[in-house]
Amino acid sequence: MKTKSAAVKRFKLTKSGQIKRKHAYTSHLAPHKSTKQKRHLRKQATVSNSELKRIGILI
């Protein structure tokens, strides 16, 4: 089965089997957000367990 190229661009698989993703709300309307909020949004997040299987199929 082919992988979805859109999903490959957005998600990374870790060695432990988790999937990393970027946070939303980072660029649009950013000036009014606090520096602390923008700093935390820069860090990668992991995909929740409920969506892990669906996204794993795509990559």
UniProtKB/Swiss-Prot annotation:
Residue stretches in coiled coil: none
A Pfam family annotated for this UniProt entry: Ribosomal_L35p
Keywords for this protein: Ribonucleoprotein, Ribosomal protein
Region entry Disordered, spans: 17-47
GO cellular component term, pick one: ribosome
Source species of the chain: Mycoplasma genitalium (strain ATCC 33530 / DSM 19775 / NCTC 10195 / G37)
Protein name: Large ribosomal subunit protein bL35
One Gene Ontology molecular-function label: structural constituent of ribosome
Family note: Belongs to the bacterial ribosomal protein bL35 family.
Keyword presence, Glycoprotein: no
GO biological process: translation
Basic residues bias locations: 17-43
